[in-house]
UniProtKB/Swiss-Prot annotation:
CDD domains: alcohol_DH_plants. Zn(2+) 1 binds at C53, S55, H72, C179. Its cofactor is Zn(2+). Its main location: cytoplasm. This is Alcohol dehydrogenase-like 6. It comes from Arabidopsis thaliana (Mouse-ear cress).
Length: 381
């Protein structure tokens, strides 16, 4: 039914299972939750699959805003729509995204930014439109996460935070494009604009870091250094284009010195993909004088201030931050999905585990122990 129809039928409250975080760092609990109808300009989605991102893990370990339903990398099918929604209808396949695109604010109409002023990253655990929740347990509110909350069989998102996708695209694969893989590719392509023959160093070889490597490889980078403390990442990283692996725990001298020696004076581009402000400084020290660019993608759990000597900038280096790799979700994700469907980019290789939704705590353990890239959780059919 079209939202413009005079016979618009208001959806009702439904109940479903959701993995709820009650206490920081403790196992999620499968609970029956009430999911309110979508309000104006919102849609309710039947989640088909969702993947665990390190941001979920970090927030779960430190988050005081509880109870909460985490999850923000997700794909599903529109179950119902709120008033005023014209872009979607019941049955559409969609990706949910943590940063939206209203299409009319200063940033959305600019070609320079994807930082929507209306539907930017939501940090209060509420919906953008009315600062309320759509989840409850026995009448008591349950907080959202990044305005997505995909660790639930059903969720409600603003229509500006959803992207309609080709129904032929496999949802259990492309769900990774709603955060990590897209963020890494975009950092290499949109933010750094890595050039053919350049040298790149990546700090942190999780899904985001390896996506940066894939993007750099596809751009023709000649040297891609990967820095991590997990030796198991060395062989895995080659698949995505890393030419040299550096275990920072094995070094007897400062990392920047090693990288400058390996690159002949410093990398053209460095990427901080851990979420550690100290590593951001190290990344800045590791890139070349004159033109070296450091791009930060990680979200720090603590100490958000970056400390760097002013001389690093006087020498011509630059530091840039990015959220979601600079992609405007509605405008750009469909073409990224096309690249996957045409086998121009890799997604499957990031999926190390496929688990049922009730195995969600196993996914958290695997990520906490560094034994996975992406665990895709499949909802009951």
């Amino acid at each position: 039914m079209s939202a413009s129809s005079s016979s618009f039928e208001q959806p009702q409250v439904i109940t479903c299972n959701a993995a709820v975080a009650w206490r920081a760092g403790e196992p999620l609990v499968m609970e029956e939750v009430e999911v309110s109808p979508p309000q104006p300009l919102e849609i309710r989605i039947k989640v088909v699959c969702t993947s665990l991102c390190r941001s979920d893990l970090s927030a779960w370990e430190s988050q005081s805003l509880l109870p909460r339903i985490f999850g923000h990398e997700a794909a599903g099918i529109v179950e119902s729509i709120g008033e005023g929604v014209t872009e979607f209808e019941k049955g559409d396949h969609v990706l949910a995204v943590f940063t939206g695109e209203c299409g009319s604010c200063r940033h959305c109409i600019s070609g320079k930014s994807n930082m929507c002023q209306v539907l930017g990253m939501e940090r209060k655990g509420l919906m953008h439109s009315d600062q309320k929740t759509r989840f409850s347990i026995k009448g008591k509110p349950v907080y959202h996460y990044c305005a997505v909350s995909s660790f639930s069989e059903y969720t409600v998102v603003h229509s500006g935070c959803a992207v309609k996708v080709d129904p032929l695209a496999p949802l259990h694969k492309i769900c990774l494009l709603s955060c990590g893989v897209a963020a890494g590719l975009g950092a290499a392509w949109n933010v750094a604009d890595v050039q053919k023959g350049s040298s790149v160093v990546i700090f942190g070889l999780g899904t985001v870091g390896l996506s940066v490597a894939q993007g750099a490889k596809l751009r023709g980078a000649a040297q891609i250094l990967g820095v991590d403390i997990n030796p198991a990442k060395a062989e895995q990283a080659k698949t995505f284009g890393v030419t040299d692996f550096i275990n920072s725990n094995d070094l007897s001298e400062p990392i920047p010195q090693v990288i400058k020696r390996m690159t002949g004076g410093g990398a053209d581009f460095s990427f901080e993909c851990v979420g550690d402000t100290g590593i951001a400084t190290t990344a800045l020290q590791s890139c070349s004088d004159g033109w070296g660019m450091t791009v930060t993608l990680g979200v720090p759990k603590a100490k958000p201030e970056v400390s760097a000597h002013y001389g690093l900038f006087l020498s011509g280096k630059s530091l840039k931050g990015t959220l979601f790799g600079g992609w405007k979700p509605k405008s750009d994700l469909p073409s990224l999905i096309d690249k996957y469907m045409n086998k121009e980019i890799m997604i499957d290789e990031f999926i190390t585990h496929n688990l049922s939704f009730d195995e969600i705590n196993k996914a958290f353990v695997l990520m906490r122990e560094g034994k996975c890239l992406r665990c895709v959780l499949h909802m009951p059919k």
